């Protein structure tokens, strides 16, 4: 499917590059049961748990009328590895920005296990 990438994903990607400059953001695009495409089963490790929390955060953001987290752009700043969501965001943007900010910080603190990249979702994420 050649759909455009949701706008917010670019911002989330840049946030990840702010907190984890040593890794490609692609390393997080298909990891465990929750990072990227998945969303079921038990998280395989702490990093995968970061993504589960991020998914849940987006689900909560969707409760805000008209809020579509994957498409919502927001205002933020990256300074020396520190992320700040800026005050110009409305309720939806502020919530989504915080979801992404907390996930990017979570990624920076979680060990990366190469064995959990591109796993078999059917086998391991029931």
From Swiss-Prot:
InterPro entries: PLipase_A2 (IPR001211), PLipase_A2_Asp_AS (IPR033112), PLipase_A2_dom (IPR016090), PLipase_A2_dom_sf (IPR036444), PLipase_A2_His_AS (IPR033113). Ca(2+) binds at residues 34, 36, 38, 55. It catalyses: a 1,2-diacyl-sn-glycero-3-phosphocholine + H2O = a 1-acyl-sn-glycero-3-phosphocholine + a fatty acid + H(+). Disulfide bonds join 18-78, 33-125, 35-51, 50-106, 57-99, 67-92, 85-97. GO terms for biological process: arachidonate secretion; fatty acid biosynthetic process; lipid catabolic process; phospholipid metabolic process; positive regulation of fibroblast proliferation. The active site is at residues 54, 100. Its EC number is 3.1.1.4. It is an enzyme of class 3 (hydrolase). Binds 1 Ca(2+) ion. It holds the Pfam family Phospholip_A2_1. Residues 2-7 form a propeptide. Its cofactor is Ca(2+). GO terms for cellular component: extracellular region. GO terms for molecular function: calcium ion binding; calcium-dependent phospholipase A2 activity; phospholipid binding; signaling receptor binding; toxin activity. Keywords: Blood coagulation cascade inhibiting toxin, Calcium, Disulfide bond, Hemostasis impairing toxin, Hydrolase, Lipid degradation, Lipid metabolism, Metal-binding, Secreted, Signal, Toxin. It is found in: Secreted. Gene3D superfamilies: Phospholipase A2 domain. CDD domains: PLA2c (cd00125). Residues 1 form the signal peptide. Expressed by the venom gland. Monomer. Belongs to the phospholipase A2 family. Group I subfamily. D49 sub-subfamily. Snake venom phospholipase A2 (PLA2) that exhibits strong anticoagulant activity, which is not due to the catalytic activity. PLA2 catalyzes the calcium-dependent hydrolysis of the 2-acyl groups in 3-sn-phosphoglycerides. This is Acidic phospholipase A2 4. It comes from Naja sagittifera (Andaman cobra). The lineage of its organism: Eukaryota, Metazoa, Chordata, Craniata, Vertebrata.
């Amino acid at each position: 499917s050649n759909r455009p990438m949701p706008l917010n994903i670019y911002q989330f990607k840049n946030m990840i590059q702010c907190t984890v400059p040593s890794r490609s953001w692609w390393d997080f695009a298909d990891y465990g049961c929750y990072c990227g495409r998945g969303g079921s089963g038990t998280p395989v490790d702490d990093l995968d748990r970061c993504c589960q929390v991020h998914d849940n955060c987006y689900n909560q953001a969707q409760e805000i009328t008209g809020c579509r987290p994957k498409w919502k752009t927001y205002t933020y700043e990256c300074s020396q590895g520190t992320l700040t969501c800026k005050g110009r965001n409305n309720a939806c943007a502020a919530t989504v920005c915080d979801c992404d900010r907390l996930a990017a910080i979570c990624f920076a603190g979680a060990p990366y296990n190469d064995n959990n990249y591109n796993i078999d979702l059917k086998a391991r994420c029931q």
